[in-house]
Amino acid sequence: MQILCLLLAALLLSFAWLSPFHTYPWVTFSSELTSFGASLILIAIFLNKNIKIARPQILMLVLTFIPLVQCGFGLITDFSVAFLSFSYLFMFWLMIVIGYNLSLQSEQRERIMLGASYLLFSISLISSIMAILQWLNLENHFDVVMGLRGSRPYANFGQPNNLATFLIVGLMGALYLYEKRKLTLWLLIPISSTILFATVLTQSRTSWIVCIFFFFYWIYKQYRNSPRFNFPKLLLWTAFYFVLAAYVLPLFTQILTSSIDTGVTQTASIAQRAGSGHERLGMWMQILHAIAERPLLGYGWNQTSIAVVESIQFNTVQVWFNSAHNVLLDLLVWNGVPLGLLIITYVALWLFWLSKNAKDMTSMIALLMVSAILIHALLEFPQRYAYFLLPLGFLLGLVQAQTPNLKSIVLNKNVIRCIGLMALIVFLLIWRDYKLFQDNSRLVFKGKQPTEEILGSSKILILTQFQKRLDWIALNPKTKMSEHDLSLLGEMVKNKATPYNLKKYTQLLVYNQKSKEAERYLLVLQRLYKQKISLAEIVELNNR
């Protein structure tokens, strides 16, 4: 039963990483759904077993309910924002617990790490081949590969930095297989070189930082261990990576451009990549100003966009963003400084304790996989994707199992059965809600009534933000509304500050004689999208 569940979970996770289906508006929905499906299958392993919850996870469980509490007190006005935030946090917590319980026996722990390494290594190779096809402009010949937009390949992840982080985690899997002598060098070296080249193709600056961190971490750890991957090999592979990035890729691009009919995607030089990306500094400065505006309670979980709109006078990057591109700043802006610092301090101390006790190769390499995702989270938002977040939790649980005798409480198998049943119901309802939204949104965009039904109802039950979107699209901006309704719509617009939403909400405000508020949203439109529209133009638009 356990082996079958692990295999099914691995298959679903593989699909999540390789899925080419990216549809509006939740572009990674298929990947998110299958990632949660994999987690449900792992829960099934414990339907007939009691499960231990170690002491570090007890406080973490309390923290997972913060979004629901914020919703109860009105800080988050949309139920689905709070519920999805809770769902991601709770499932992340549950993956830590499951990873811990599955790895309490040292032999089982090593087998699980070997299985994870094989999986990551093989999917990394497939993703690398996809990225190379995109670089060569050959992806259109393969239905299972996404078309490339831009100049940085991303395989089926849709985002180059996400691909780079995943490939680095896959390389850590290769390192574990090498240390455990599970694959021959004639397989490991060419496959790892292919993955490394695909990582270079992404031109991810995050991967440079991860590489430097790995270099020094491995030097520090090898003094207490005797790894096969010793310092000379470490130096050779690190140098190989930077030579590929600085010299080999531009040379290959130049040669292939003249010799292949389709040409190749032109890539930026390492100097160009190093000299770009300064807009993050502007984002961070604006978020710091936003935190200063609401230091005690913050803006609510996953509501960075509201902070951006409300601190628009400090915006210098002229771009809308719904993440601070730094998980620490996000935690502070969502929860306020006191609670945010408590969460950051607790998690940091736990991670430090895990690292301090990491003495075997399994823990060291699992922590390197974790570090790749966490470093990325300091510069972007991989934690918002279930295909990163849930494996991250599982790996952290596996590392924690290096100390199997932690004080813990035992959760009865009946509780696990209830959790599994509720999770399955929510899983099916979310699939239903999203499918219903997609079907009805097509009708609304055609000017028709949203009459599609699933299971005899057209009402969206959990994903309320999508129901609000349907109502918003169908709403005539020349509609009289109460102060309360206008305020609720304003929160929705701030949390999804697209040009369409900002402009339409401005029309609605003008029609309801809220000219001062309308001018403020026109300023937001100008600062974020460089679209300068006067109040008189909005009035004229309403008079048509």
Regions flagged by a language model, labelled:
Residues 1-84, 90-118, 177-186, 405-491, ...:
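Transmembrane signal-anchor hairpin modules in multi-pass inner-membrane enzymes, especially those
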Residues 6-18, 34-44, 64, 68-71, ...:
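Alpha-helical transmembrane segments of multi-pass inner-membrane proteins
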Residues 21-24, 75-87, 148-163, 272-276, ...:
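Short aromatic-rich membrane-water interface segments that cap or initiate transmembrane helices
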Residues 22-29, 158-161, 189-224, 248, ...:
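Helix-loop-helix junctions and helix-breaking kinks within/between transmembrane helices
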Residues 159, 279-321, 328, 335-341:
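TM-adjacent membrane-interface loops and short helices in multi-pass inner/ER membrane proteins
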Residues 178-251, 392-402, 413-421:
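Hydrophobic alpha-helical segments of polytopic membrane proteins
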Residues 214, 246-284, 438-448:
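Flexible juxtamembrane loops connecting transmembrane helices in multi-pass membrane enzymes
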Residues 215, 361-414:
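Transmembrane alpha-helices of multi-pass inner-membrane enzymes
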